[in-house]
């Protein structure tokens, strides 16, 4: 083993840099090309910027449809609030007249 100059940084030591440039191939040989290729291709770890996912905007025709629905009055599915009171009064009046 050849002695290494102590003044050189570790990334400049002979043999620390691969002789060929990195490429986009994912074969076994290229995955083990260098540490960066191994992390990126072999393990699937990349530290680059993540792409923002675009929110899908609704077309104008659908927005108009939603606006028209919200302007309509809400229908009451629970029944008329005056209904049960009147029924109780009717039941009470029937029981009073029957005896």
UniProtKB/Swiss-Prot annotation:
Question: Where is this chain's protein located in or outside the cell?
Answer: Host nucleus, Host nucleolus; Host cytoplasm; Secreted
User: Which residues of the sequence carry a binding annotation for Zn(2+) 1?
Assistant: 22, 33-34, 37
Self-association or partners: how does it assemble?
Answer: Interacts with host CCNT1. Associates with the P-TEFb complex composed at least of Tat, P-TEFb (CDK9 and CCNT1), TAR RNA, RNA Pol II. Recruits the HATs CREBBP, TAF1/TFIID, EP300, PCAF and GCN5L2. Interacts with host KAT5/Tip60; this interaction targets the latter to degradation. Interacts with the host deacetylase SIRT1. Interacts with host capping enzyme RNGTT; this interaction stimulates RNGTT. Binds to host KDR, and to the host integrins ITGAV/ITGB3 and ITGA5/ITGB1. Interacts with host KPNB1/importin beta-1 without previous binding to KPNA1/importin alpha-1. Interacts with EIF2AK2.
Task: Tell me where in this chain the PTM Asymmetric dimethylarginine is found.
Answer: 52
**Major localization class:** host cell
Q: What is one GO biological process annotated to this record?
A: symbiont-mediated suppression of host translation initiation
Q: How is it modified after translation?
A: Asymmetrical arginine methylation by host PRMT6 seems to diminish the transactivation capacity of Tat and affects the interaction with host CCNT1.
Enumerate the residues marked as the site Essential for Tat translocation through the endosomal membrane: 11
Q: Which gene encodes it?
A: tat
- Specify the protein name: Protein Tat
Keyword annotations = Acetylation, Activator, AIDS, Apoptosis, Host cytoplasm, Host nucleus, Host-virus interaction, Inhibition of host innate immune response by virus, Inhibition of host interferon signaling pathway by virus, Interferon antiviral system evasion, Isopeptide bond, Metal-binding, Methylation, Modulation of host chromatin by virus, Modulation of host PP1 activity by virus, Phosphoprotein, RNA-binding, Secreted, Transcription, Transcription regulation, Ubl conjugation, Viral immunoevasion, Zinc
Additional information? HIV-1 lineages are divided in three main groups, M (for Major), O (for Outlier), and N (for New, or Non-M, Non-O). The vast majority of strains found worldwide belong to the group M. Group O seems to be endemic to and largely confined to Cameroon and neighboring countries in West Central Africa, where these viruses represent a small minority of HIV-1 strains. The group N is represented by a limited number of isolates from Cameroonian persons. The group M is further subdivided in 9 clades or subtypes (A to D, F to H, J and K).
The GO terms describing molecular function are: actinin binding; cyclin binding; metal ion binding; protein domain specific binding; protein serine/threonine phosphatase inhibitor activity; RNA-binding transcription regulator activity; trans-activation response element binding
Key word Isomerase present in the record? no
Spell out the residue ranges making up region: Interaction with the host capping enzyme RNGTT: 49-86
Q: Where is this region: Cysteine-rich?
A: 22-37
Bias kind Polar residues: ranges: 60-75
Q: Which organism is it from?
A: Human immunodeficiency virus type 1 group M subtype H (isolate 90CF056)
| Role | Transcriptional activator that increases RNA Pol II processivity, thereby increasing the level of full-length viral transcripts. Recognizes a hairpin structure at the 5'-LTR of the nascent viral mRNAs referred to as the transactivation responsive RNA element (TAR) and recruits the cyclin T1-CDK9 complex (P-TEFb complex) that will in turn hyperphosphorylate the RNA polymerase II to allow efficient elongation. The CDK9 component of P-TEFb and other Tat-activated kinases hyperphosphorylate the C-terminus of RNA Pol II that becomes stabilized and much more processive. Extracellular circulating Tat can be endocytosed by surrounding uninfected cells via the binding to several surface receptors such as CD26, CXCR4, heparan sulfate proteoglycans (HSPG) or LDLR. Neurons are rarely infected, but they internalize Tat via their LDLR. Through its interaction with nuclear HATs, Tat is potentially able to control the acetylation-dependent cellular gene expression. Modulates the expression of many cellular genes involved in cell survival, proliferation or in coding for cytokines or cytokine receptors. Tat plays a role in T-cell and neurons apoptosis.
User: At what positions is N6-acetyllysine found?
Assistant: 28, 50-51
Q: Per the record, what about its domains?
A: The cell attachment site mediates the interaction with ITGAV/ITGB3 and ITGA5/ITGB1 integrins, leading to vascular cell migration and invasion. This interaction also provides endothelial cells with the adhesion signal they require to grow in response to mitogens. The Cys-rich region may bind 2 zinc ions. This region is involved in binding to KAT5.
GO CC annotations on file: extracellular region; host cell cytoplasm; host cell nucleolus
């Amino acid at each position: 083993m050849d002695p290494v100059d102590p003044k050189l940084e570790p990334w400049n030591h002979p043999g620390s840099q691969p002789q060929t440039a990195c490429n986009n191939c994912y074969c076994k040989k290229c995955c083990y090309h260098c540490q960066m290729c191994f992390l990126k291709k072999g393990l699937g770890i990349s530290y680059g910027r993540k792409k923002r996912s675009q929110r899908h905007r609704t077309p104008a025709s659908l927005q108009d449809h939603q606006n028209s629905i919200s302007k309509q009055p809400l229908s009451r599915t629970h029944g008329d609030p005056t209904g049960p009171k009147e029924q109780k009064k009717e039941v009470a009046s029937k029981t009073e007249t029957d005896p």
